[in-house]
C-alpha cells in the first residue's frame, strides 16, 4: 500500500460501468487531461448498449442540419414538454437539448467515434406538437473489430437471434436490401460482400468482425479509450464508496482476489445501467405481473444504487411503471438457455398482423412504439388478461416478413412449433384454442382487420395513420402500409411478454449529473449517467435511441463538470495563496 493516505491507486475520475454512458464519461475525462479509471464488474465491455440498435436521439444535431430536415430547438422543447408534462425536472431536459448537439460535435472532433443521420426515424409520439419525421436520431458507422486485436473478444455480443449465420451483423436497412437480393442486383452484391467478409472472419474469430448498431458504438468507444491509455479494470467489483467530510473521495474495489483502495480526487461516475436484470428490484418496483425476462445486460442489477444510497443519495419518485419496455417472445435454445427476442418494428407494424388479449380482442395500435405497445398490454390487463399478448397472422405473412425469431423466407416452421414458440392451425377456432383466447373474439377481430385492410382505415386504433407507423410498414401495401388481411390458412401466432430494456427509476441528479441527497443537495464528488440516473423524461420514450442519447450526453456533462471543478478549485487555491501572501 502506498503512503498516500492509505490509497493503493489515485485517479482523478473513476467510472463504474462500461456501457455507452460510462465509456463516454471516461473518454471525455481522458481528453480533458484527467487520470481516468473505468471499472467493469464483468469480463466484457458494452453493457446493454452492445446488444442494442445503438441509435442516439439528439435533437438539433449537426447531421440533422446536413439532411436539410427542419431543425428547431424550440420544437424539440415543445415536444418533450408535451410528452413529459411535468413528470420530471425540466432543467435536465434543457441541459439535454442544449448540450446534446455539442456532445456529438465534441466526440467527432476529438475521437474516431462517428455517426450518421438515421434519416427515416420518426419520433414515437406523432400525436404531439413538435414531433418530427426524422433527423433527430443518429446511428453509429460500421466498425472494424479487427482493429482491436485480441481485445475484440472483450466486446459484448449482440443478441444471438439478431445475427445471421450465428455471428454476422447487419443493419435494418441492410436486412431490407438482402431480402430483395433475389430480384435486386444491389441486394445480391451486398449479400455477396457481407457473406464473403464473414466467411473470412470465421477462419480466425468466433463471430464476424464487421460491427454495426450498438456493437459498433461500444467497440468504437472502447477503441478510443485504449488509444488514450485509459486504465480499464474488468472483473472488478466495487464494494463501497469512501465518503469523507461530505465528499466522495474514492472507493473500495475487489479485483484479482484482493481489495484495492482507489482514490478519486475529482469524483466517481455511476453508470451501472439501472436494474432491469435484478429479479429482486423488478419485483419491488415494476408493475404486476412482474416481468420475468429481460434482454438487458445481466450486470444491470442496481448495485450502484446501493453504493450511492450508502453515502446519502436518494432515488427519484416512482413513475407509472419505472421501466422502458419491449414486447418480447421467448424460446428455449438447443443448449438449454433462454432466447429473448424483442419485437421492435420488423413484424408488429407490417400489414396482416394483429395483437389480441385473452378475449381475442385487439387492444392497441400494433405499430406503435415498443414502449407504448407494452404499456398498452398492462393497461388492457387491468380489465382482461393481456399478458402475454398474442400476435396473430397467417403463413403468407411469416414467409414475407418473418415473425419474431422466424426470419422471412423460412421454408418450414415445424421446428418452431415443436419448441413451443410458434402456434399454427388450419382454422382460427383451433388457433384460439391452442393459444388460450376466446375463439369468437378472435374471429371478429380478424374479420374487422380484413375490412380495415380493404378500406385502409383502422377505425379502432388507427394503425398506419401516422408517419411512425408507416415508416415501419410496407410501402408496397395499398391503401395503408400497415393494414393487410389475415385470410389464408394456416394461421400463426406467437406470445409476447413485457420485458424491460431499461429502467426509468434511478438516482436523483441535477443538470450537472451530480447525484442528489434527500434534500436535493448535490453530493460532492458523485455523479450518475445513463439509466443509473432517474429518467429525465419521466419514464416517457420520445424517439429511437433516447436512452443512449441521454447516457452519452450526461456522461459527457459529468466528465466536463468534474474537470472544470478541478480548474475552479485550482483557481480558488491560487486566489487563497495570493490573499495569504
List each language-model region with its residue ranges.
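A glycine-rich dinucleotide-binding beta-alpha-beta segment and adjacent secondary-structure elements
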Residues: 240, 247, 441-536, 540
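Extreme N-terminal leader/targeting segments of oxidoreductases
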Residues: 1-13, 31, 215, 219, ...
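Glycine-rich loop(s) and the adjacent beta-strand/alpha-helix scaffold that form part
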Residues: 208-215, 227, 255-334, 548, ...
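N-terminal Rossmann-like FAD-binding beta1-loop-alpha1 element of flavoenzymes
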Residues: 13-38
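Conserved N-terminal/central alpha/beta ligand/cofactor-binding core
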Residues: 41-231, 352-355, 362, 396-399, ...
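Internal hydrophobic alpha-helix adjacent to the cofactor/substrate pocket in enzyme cavities
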Residues: 307-314, 443, 550-570
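An anion/pyrophosphate-binding glycine-rich loop and adjacent beta-alpha core
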Residues: 126, 134, 141-189, 305-307, ...
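Helix-rich C-terminal "cap"/substrate-channel and partner-interaction subdomain
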Residues: 383-490, 561, 565, 580-581
Amino acid at each position: 500500500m502506498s503512503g498516500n493516505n492509505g490509497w493503493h491507486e489515485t485517479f482523478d475520475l473513476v467510472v463504474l460501468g462500461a456501457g455507452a454512458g460510462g465509456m463516454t464519461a471516461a473518454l471525455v475525462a481522458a481528453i480533458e487531461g484527467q487520470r481516468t479509471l473505468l471499472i467493469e464488474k464483468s469480463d466484457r465491455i458494452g453493457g446493454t448498449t452492445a446488444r442494442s440498435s445503438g441509435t442516439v436521439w439528439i435533437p438539433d444535431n449537426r447531421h440533422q442540419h446536413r439532411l436539410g430536415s427542419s431543425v428547431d430547438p424550440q420544437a424539440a422543447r415543445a415536444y418533450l414538454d408535451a410528452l413529459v408534462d411535468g413528470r420530471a425536472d425540466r432543467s435536465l431536459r434543457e441541459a439535454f437539448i442544449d448540450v446534446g448537439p455539442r456532445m456529438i460535435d465534441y466526440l467527432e472532433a476529438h475521437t474516431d467515434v462517428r455517426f450518421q443521420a438515421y434519416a427515416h426515424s420518426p419520433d414515437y409520439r406523432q400525436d404531439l406538437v413538435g414531433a418530427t419525421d426524422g433527423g433527430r436520431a443518429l446511428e453509429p458507422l460500421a466498425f472494424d473489430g479487427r482493429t482491436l486485436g485480441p481485445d475484440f473478444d472483450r466486446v459484448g455480443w449482440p443478441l444471438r437471434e439478431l445475427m445471421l449465420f450465428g455471428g454476422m451483423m447487419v443493419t435494418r436497412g441492410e436486412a431490407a436490401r438482402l431480402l430483395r437480393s433475389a430480384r435486386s442486383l444491389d441486394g445480391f452484391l451486398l449479400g455477396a460482400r457481407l457473406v464473403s467478409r464473414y466467411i473470412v472472419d470465421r477462419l480466425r474469430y468466433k463471430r464476424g468482425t464487421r460491427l454495426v448498431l450498438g456493437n459498433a458504438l461500444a467497440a468504437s468507444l472502447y477503441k478510443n479509450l485504449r488509444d488514450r491509455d485509459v486504465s480499464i479494470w474488468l472483473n472488478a467489483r466495487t464494494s463501497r464508496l469512501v465518503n469523507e467530510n461530505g465528499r466522495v473521495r474514492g472507493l473500495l474495489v475487489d479485483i484479482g482476489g484482493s481489495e484495492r483502495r482507489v482514490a478519486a480526487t475529482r469524483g466517481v461516475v455511476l453508470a451501472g445501467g439501472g436494474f432491469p436484470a435484478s429479479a429482486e428490484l423488478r419485483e419491488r418496483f415494476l408493475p404486476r405481473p412482474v416481468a420475468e425476462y429481460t434482454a438487458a445486460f445481466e450486470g444491470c442489477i442496481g448495485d450502484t444504487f446501493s453504493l450511492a444510497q450508502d453515502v446519502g443519495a436518494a432515488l427519484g419518485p416512482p413513475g407509472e411503471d419505472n421501466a422502458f419496455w419491449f414486447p418480447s417472445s421467448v424460446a428455449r435454445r438447443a443448449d438449454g438457455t433462454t432466447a429473448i427476442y424483442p419485437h421492435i418494428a420488423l413484424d408488429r407494424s407490417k400489414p396482416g398482423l394483429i395483437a389480441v388479449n385473452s378475449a381475442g380482442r385487439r387492444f392497441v395500435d400494433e405499430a406503435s412504439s415498443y414502449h407504448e405497445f407494452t404499456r398498452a398490454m398492462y393497461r388492457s390487463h387491468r380489465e382482461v388478461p393481456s399478458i402475454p399478448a398474442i400476435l396473430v397472422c397467417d403463413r403468407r405473412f411469416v414467409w414475407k416478413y418473418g415473425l419474431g425469431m422466424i426470419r422471412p423466407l423460412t421454408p418450414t416452421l415445424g421446428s418452431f412449433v415443436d419448441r413451443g414458440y410458434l402456434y399454427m392451425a388450419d382454422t382460427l377456432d383451433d388457433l384460439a384454442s391452442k393459444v388460450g383466447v376466446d375463439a369468437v373474439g378472435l374471429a371478429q377481430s380478424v374479420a374487422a382487420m380484413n375490412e380495415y385492410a380493404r378500406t385502409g382505415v383502422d377505425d379502432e386504433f388507427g394503425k398506419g395513420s401516422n408517419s411512425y407507423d408507416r415508416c415501419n410498414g410496407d410501402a408496397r401495401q395499398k391503401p395503408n402500409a400497415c393494414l393487410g388481411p389475415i385470410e389464408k390458412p394456416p394461421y400463426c401466432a406467437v406470445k409476447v411478454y413485457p420485458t424491460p430494456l431499461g429502467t426509468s427509476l434511478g438516482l436523483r441528479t441535477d443538470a450537472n449529473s451530480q447525484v442528489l441527497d434527500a434534500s436535493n443537495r448535490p453530493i460532492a464528488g458523485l455523479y450518475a449517467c445513463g439509466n443509473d440516473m432517474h429518467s429525465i423524461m419521466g419514464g416517457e420514450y420520445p424517439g429511437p435511441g433516447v436512452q443512449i442519447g441521454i447516457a452519452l450526453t450526461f456522461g459527457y456533462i459529468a466528465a466536463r463538470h468534474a474537470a472544470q471543478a478541478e480548474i475552479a478549485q485550482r483557481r480558488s487555491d491560487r486566489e487563497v495563496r495570493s490573499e495569504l501572501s
